[in-house]
């Protein structure tokens, strides 16, 4: 993994021990501890940092087999929020220094990468992210208890809900964690897009004098350079680097301090301001507290906007890959204008066949991102009244889109774009034999002559170049000058015809 949000497919297997309730005597009593919730007592593995709420969530949501720990930036974001909350509550005199410092120490360990394997709830879950929030509360509480010299589960000294979750609700913690994690992932994606853009820019410079035929609707149009074609790809990608930066700013508005529905119940009047300040200091992000916390708690518009931009990126890069596959088609019976690097054998039955597998895999990532956008759209629309209960699938979809598209950009540049070569003679022959060349000659030989040349070239298969010379419409030197890439591919002053 190169960095950023990890792809979900890196998980091979995910199993969490599930123990029965305490109604009978356990054979593993020395290896478990008992925890209690409103549904009763449960045995928890003695060495587990998660607790009863997490255990029930694992049992209730065996959906994907992918734990939330697959997204380390989400886990770090949760720890950052709990740390900021503890600092704020201590500053407000609501949390004593001893327990507050222990919570902060536990959060810093998690942000450094420790205990991520204890975040075991499934990425898709009911409850608007409550299972994820409680998983974080329990892990932090039990590690803080250890720091204080107590055993795991000894919640009389420090409680997951009362101290770790103080002044908070899942309904402000979860969306804020999603925004923090996604923000960092988006900038990793932007970095990868810049790598791909620069790859196309290098090829544009390499191919700046290579003349070729442009095509509209797959038919010959007018000449251009291969450099112009590749430069366009770089511009397309660069535009969306900016769009992603704009979308990233939208997700910097958070609803911490909203608690349950945005009214701020069970929190101090100064808490929302303080927790945002501490989060800015911890994350380095330009976070701001939403003006209307009730609106911010129920509205998923920023996620919809970001997902839409990710779809835009996917559509553009997929279109570029379509072009690369088409331009390299053949090699004997296709366009064969460019060569893509051969990276693996292409067929189990056709010897010597090589396929454009890198553009193909990027196409598939784009299809996935487009599908993820539809999922985000439906999930955002399905919110009801003061809360959207479907943010877990929004999170999973956004994380996949950001992560997979990032890897796709890096792979496309490294294993395809950097090694592309031009079939220069083939490209030149296409230009010289194309009837579309008459469009470039029209200002010099006139529309009627250009039409006559086009009709004869089509009927006889002869080149426009040869027919113009044969008919004496232009001297060879003039024709050669007109066919220079600088003349054919840019606006020029027109010759005045007698």
Language-model region placement:
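Conserved, well-structured ligand/cofactor-binding cores
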Residues: 24-498
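C-terminal lid/capping helical subdomain adjacent to the catalytic/cofactor pocket in oxidative enzymes
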Residues: 1-22
């Amino acid at each position: 993994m190169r960095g950023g949000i990890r792809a979900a497919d890196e998980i091979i297997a995910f199993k969490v021990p599930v123990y029965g309730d305490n109604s009978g005597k356990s054979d593993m009593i020395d290896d478990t501890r008992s925890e209690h919730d409103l549904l009763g007592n449960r045995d928890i593995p003695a060495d587990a940092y998660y607790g009863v709420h997490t255990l029930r969530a694992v049992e209730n949501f065996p959906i994907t087999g992918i734990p939330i720990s697959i997204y380390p930036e989400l886990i770090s974001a949760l720890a950052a929020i709990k740390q900021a909350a503890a600092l704020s509550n201590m500053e407000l005199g609501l949390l004593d220094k001893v327990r507050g410092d222990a919570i902060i120490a536990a959060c810093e360990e998690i942000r450094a990468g420790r205990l991520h394997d204890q975040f075991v709830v499934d990425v898709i879950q009911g409850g608007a992210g409550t299972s994820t929030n409680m998983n974080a509360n329990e892990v932090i509480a039990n590690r803080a208890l250890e720091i204080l010299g107590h055993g795991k589960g000894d919640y009389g000294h420090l409680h997951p809900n009362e101290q770790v979750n103080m002044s908070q609700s899942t309904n402000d913690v979860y969306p804020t964690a999603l925004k923090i994690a996604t923000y960092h992932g988006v900038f990793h994606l932007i970095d990868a897009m810049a790598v791909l853009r620069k790859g196309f820019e290098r090829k544009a410079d390499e191919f700046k004098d290579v003349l070729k035929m442009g095509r509209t609707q797959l038919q010959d149009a007018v000449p251009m350079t291969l450099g112009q074609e590749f430069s366009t790809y770089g511009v397309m990608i660069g535009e969306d680097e900016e769009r992603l930066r704009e979308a990233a700013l939208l997700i910097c508005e958070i609803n911490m301090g909203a608690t349950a529905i945005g009214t701020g119940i069970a929190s101090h009047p100064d808490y929302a301001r303080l927790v945002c300040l501490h989060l800015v200091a911890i994350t380095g992000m330009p976070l701001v507290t939403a003006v209307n916390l009730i609106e911010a708690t129920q509205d998923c518009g920023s996620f919809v906007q970001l997902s839409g931009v990710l779809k835009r990126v996917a559509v553009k890069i997929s279109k570029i890959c379509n072009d690369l596959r088409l331009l390299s088609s053949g090699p004997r019976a296709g366009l064969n204008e460019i060569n893509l690097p051969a990276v693996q054998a292409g067929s189990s039955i056709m010897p010597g066949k090589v396929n454009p597998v890198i553009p193909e895999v990027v196409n598939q990532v784009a299809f996935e991102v487009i599908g993820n956008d539809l999922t985000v759209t439906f999930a955002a629309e399905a919110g009801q009244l003061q809360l959207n209960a479907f943010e877990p699938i929004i999170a999973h979809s956004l994380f996949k889109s950001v992560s997979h598209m990032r890897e796709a950009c890096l792979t496309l540049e490294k294993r395809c774009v950097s090694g592309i070569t031009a079939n220069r003679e083939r490209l030149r022959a296409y230009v010289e034999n194309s009837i579309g060349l008459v469009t470039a000659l029209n200002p010099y030989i006139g529309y009627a002559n250009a039409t006559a040349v086009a009709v004869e070239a089509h009927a006889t298969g002869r080149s426009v170049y040869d027919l113009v010379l044969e008919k004496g419409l232009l001297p060879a030197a003039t024709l050669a000058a007109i066919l220079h890439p600088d003349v054919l591919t840019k606006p020029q002053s027109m010759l005045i015809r007698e």
